[in-house]
Amino acid sequence: MRSAYTRRLFYDLRVESVVSNKLDAVHDVLLMGPGPSCVYPDVYRALAHPTLGHLDPLFIAIMDDIKTLLRTLMQTTNRATLPMSGTGSAGMEAAFVNLVKPGDAVLVLVNGVFGKRMAEVAGRLRAQVYTLEFDWGTPVVPETVAARLQMKDYALVAVVHAETSTGVRNPVDKIGESVKMSGALYLVDAVTSLGGIPVHMDAWGIDLLYSGTQKCLSCPPGLAPLSCSERALAKLRARTTPVPNWYLDLSLLLSYWEGAKRAYHHTAPINMLYGLYQALQCVMAEGLENVYARHRNMHELLVAELGKLGLEILVEPDYRLPMLNAVKVPAGVDEAGVRARLLGEHSIEIGAGLGPLAGKIWRVGLMGHTARAVNVQRLIEALRAEL
């Protein structure tokens, strides 16, 4: 007669043998949409390393290296530079909950979905939200921003660097000049831009910048690199009410991320941080200028090959993003059908348009590890077969 332990073990093995695991059906898909991007093989290997405790000395050393690597990538000396636990949207939420108080006048520059989302988050914090809107597919105009800033004082001005919904690169450097003169804090969404095009946080006068790991860093989604200037930290320290989100409170998180003695805040996503650490190592090994040149060259190759198929880019050349290409859908073409066939027949994923651009564009990503000539050619051959 089997013991209770043996019966239980037998039952567990029997269940394991008959229950299907849907992970067995996961296969390689060429991710050429607006994110996530293809993950570096070295990052997959890093994710599989044994999990350490979140206060283990070796893990603390890895955390410190991550901060240094992020500062190099963001071109900043900010002490408060760290990856938040959560996707890029957590980074956005963290930026606003730490810097915005009820009643603050906040100006959000909007030319796509993610600018609108910034305005919504600020509104939920009961800020006085003002928007300055531009046509989707066109950049924010610095002169228009400068004129608005002369009309009213704002506590904070927010803009998206790389508007993922449209493929537009906003001139955050020029915008920053006017924001600095106004005295407002300057908040920039770099979710898609970081690691794909140059970001100069300090030189551009940015007070708080956030990003995500799943775009040009070619790491799985789950972390939001963020950096905060001393000026922004001063506003945080001057708060007379608590930050309204405990999990994203930078004043608490910094006690875990810096200093000789670390204070527990929450259990860090250990293996995701391994992945980010390795992804940053991959970027630095290639060299920042080489990484930016690769994105630019693959964009130019894609545009040239799309042109041979009669396909056009929505955005004017001077403001195009190399890593996110908004491709106009030709008249009479079933854009959703093409996307479905690319995924089903060719294992290639591209994105659809959003908002007023829904049904009018495809969003083709060339982010991070995805930005390779072999991937561009594979997509072009698939489009040639399906159009």
Region locations from a protein language model:
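Conserved PLP-binding catalytic core of the aspartate aminotransferase-like
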Residues: 312-345
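Active-site phosphate-binding strand-loop segment of PLP-dependent enzymes
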Residues: 139-195, 208, 216
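Active-site C-terminal subdomain of aminotransferase-like
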Residues: 38-39, 214-303
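PLP-dependent enzyme catalytic core of the Aspartate aminotransferase-like
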Residues: 22, 356, 360-387
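A glycine-/small-polar-enriched, mobile loop at the entrance of the PLP active site in fold-type I
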Residues: 28-85, 89
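Conserved active-site segment immediately N-terminal to the catalytic lysine
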Residues: 202-214
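Conserved beta-loop-alpha segment that forms the PLP phosphate-binding cup at the N-terminus of a helix
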Residues: 79-107, 111, 115-119
